[in-house]
């Protein structure tokens, strides 16, 4: 009799466990917030035979009742789609530089049970801004009828003095062209590049294809917020990369990049504030 009761209990517990696994919403272990705030806004950026990562940072209706959706990535990810030629201009009667920006393919992943990638939805995007020195670029999705379902939250300005060294960070990207995956580490240091622009050093490993993705912290606002765009890793010798010494373009440089290119509204700037920032830049 005891054996029968034990067998029934085992079967019931297995059914409960199976049911819980099949329906993640009933499973408190599933990190729903992490999926929605870090994993799902990550996209694959494809150019020619290469690829990198990107992050959806804005998707809202504009005054024409059309959705404007933007993806943040690295300049070096999309640089092959910007062609600059020095050509003769009959009008100016001299050689001038002409620029052509080819469209970029952006793939958004779809998931089952939160974590299982089951395919992608392709979008075409245009390169609307880039900064070679900061290694940043902004893409605009050409589809204006649909809103991007998940958008990353940018670390806000003047709310605290963070992020700080020793904070846990999460690097998310579509490394090697695979579905996005996270790695964890610490914010390990602050530095500057040879032109004096700020950099973050993090111990969260990144690999080829992670460039253009995102670096997050869990903020005092109980939200995972983007603090940087992974751009490069340290190396020594001939091609010996150190993946856990990863350098990102920090949120301070992202803000300057967006405002310099008149996309301050992505940061929440009002139009008049954006104009004031432009005037300040012109006065310098």
Annotate the PLM regions.
Residues 41-44, 68-74, 162-176, 202, ...:
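Active-site-proximal beta-strands of protease catalytic cores
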Residues 25-35, 82-113, 226-284:
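C-terminal cap/linker of serine protease catalytic domains
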Residues 29, 33-34, 52-55, 60-62, ...:
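Active-site substrate-binding loop(s) of clan PA
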Residues 30, 42-74, 245:
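A conserved glycine-rich beta-strand in the N-terminal activation segment of trypsin-fold
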Residues 59-129:
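Catalytic-histidine neighborhood of serine endopeptidases
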Residues 33, 128-134, 145-146, 178, ...:
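Gly/Ser-enriched beta-turn/beta-hairpin loop segments
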Residues 1-4:
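Positively charged n-region of N-terminal signal peptides that target proteins for export
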Residues 8-16:
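Bacterial N-terminal signal peptides
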């Amino acid at each position: 009799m005891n054996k029968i009761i034990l067998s029934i209990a085992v079967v019931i517990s297995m059914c409960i466990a199976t049911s819980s696994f099949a329906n993640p919403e009933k499973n408190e272990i599933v990190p729903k917030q992490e999926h929605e705030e870090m994993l799902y806004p990550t996209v694959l950026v494809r150019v020619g035979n290469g690829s990198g990562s990107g992050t959806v940072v804005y998707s809202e209706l504009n005054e024409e009742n059309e959705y404007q959706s933007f993806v943040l990535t690295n300049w070096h990810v999309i640089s092959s789609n910007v062609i600059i030629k020095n050509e003769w201009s009959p009008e100016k009667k001299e050689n001038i530089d002409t620029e052509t920006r080819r469209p970029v393919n952006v793939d958004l992943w779809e998931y089952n049970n939160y974590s299982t990638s089951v395919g992608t939805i392709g979008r075409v995007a245009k390169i609307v801004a880039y900064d070679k020195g900061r290694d940043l670029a902004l893409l605009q999705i050409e589809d204006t009828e649909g809103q991007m379902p998940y958008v990353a939250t940018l670390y806000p300005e003047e709310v605290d003095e963070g992020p700080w060294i020793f904070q846990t960070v999460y690097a998310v990207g579509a490394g090697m062209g695979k579905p996005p995956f996270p790695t964890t580490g610490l914010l390990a240091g602050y530095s500057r590049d040879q032109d004096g622009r700020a950099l973050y050093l993090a111990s969260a490993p990144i690999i080829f294809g992670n460039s253009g993705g995102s670096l997050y912290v869990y903020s005092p606002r109980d939200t995972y917020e983007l603090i940087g765009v992974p751009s490069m890793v340290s190396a020594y010798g001939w091609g010996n990369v150190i993946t856990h010494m990863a350098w990102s373009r920090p949120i301070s440089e992202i803000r300057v990049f967006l405002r310099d290119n008149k996309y301050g509204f992505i940061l929440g700037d009002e139009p008049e504030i954006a104009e004031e920032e432009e005037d300040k830049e012109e006065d310098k």
